[in-house]
Amino acid sequence: MKKIRILSLFIFTTILTSGTFGQDLKVNSNGLDIYYRIMGKGLPILIIGGGPGDVSDRYLSLCELLSKDFQCILVDQRGTGKSTPAQIDSSSISLALTIEDFEAIRNHLGFKQWTVLGFSYGGFVAAVYTNDYPTSVSSLIHMGSLGFDFNVYRHFSDNIVSRLHPGDLELLKYWSDSTRMATDKHHAIVETIKARMPGYFFSREKALLVTQTMKDSDFNLSLGDYLWDDMYKRSLELLKKNSDFDKPVLILHGRQDPLGESVAQSLSRYYKNSKLVFVEKSGHYSWIEQPEKILAAIKAFLSPTK
């Protein structure tokens, strides 16, 4: 039994760290080179990762999973990774520019339409993209999406902290100390993210494995300064009425996601043609905890009607 457990953990670690990363490609969008990678063949799926500020490497495992059956396009969003401008300010970082970057990639690749998958914060970005460029999107997938009501952050954070063990809370307190924040704020904040990570997951073992792969360079924490106000304004616009987007929408949500079920249910009501799937025994990072279920759900969603 112990050998089986060790083997399963090895396989899971391989999912997080291995694979063909794809060739670095780029397109110029509004004066900035936006870098992206393509993995797999078939129906194109744009992956919009979370954050704001996550580098695309954090979602390689998702892209690798989908590349078994689809063509996955993974982007270093504006301000992250290789797509970082010389100067980060309101002139170089905005939600509108980020959306235009996606359009630049789609046009460069010659896709009339593509499926858009947004995770967490990326789900909000995907909703804005779909609203602004509905003819560019053939279908939409929300995965652990934040939705549009930012009040969820209150219980999201509470739910995460409520799941932490005493050792996690000690680490959180240690790295939240003002002295450590003053010494190296970026590193300290990343360590607090790592300390909170078990609260995002159903499986503590998998959460701890994820923390082992996390690096300071995985995050550009300054992007929120230039995006949150914009996001709030766009969320109010989106909430004024239900979406006019009438193409298929899949909402994948971990049953144990600390966001709670109401976010996914609200999204399901928001779209005319939506399907809501709760992923059992899964927290926020559903493709890491239940990869087979996620791939099966997406394959069923994107398969042509027979």
Briefly describe each language-model feature range.
Residues 245, 251-253:
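Short beta-strand/loop motif that positions the catalytic acidic residue
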Residues 77-119:
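Active-site loop/oxyanion-hole signature of alpha/beta-hydrolase fold enzymes
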Residues 258-263:
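Conserved alpha/beta-hydrolase "acid-adjacent" motif
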Residues 112-155:
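Conserved hydrolase catalytic core segment
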Residues 179-225:
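Conserved alpha/beta-hydrolase catalytic His-Asp/Glu region
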Residues 274-306:
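Catalytic active-site module of serine/aspartate enzymes centered on a nucleophile-bearing elbow/loop
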Residues 140-178:
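Flexible "cap/lid" loop of the alpha/beta hydrolase fold
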Residues 32-85:
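Conserved HGGG/HGGXW glycine-rich cap/lid loop of the alpha/beta-hydrolase fold
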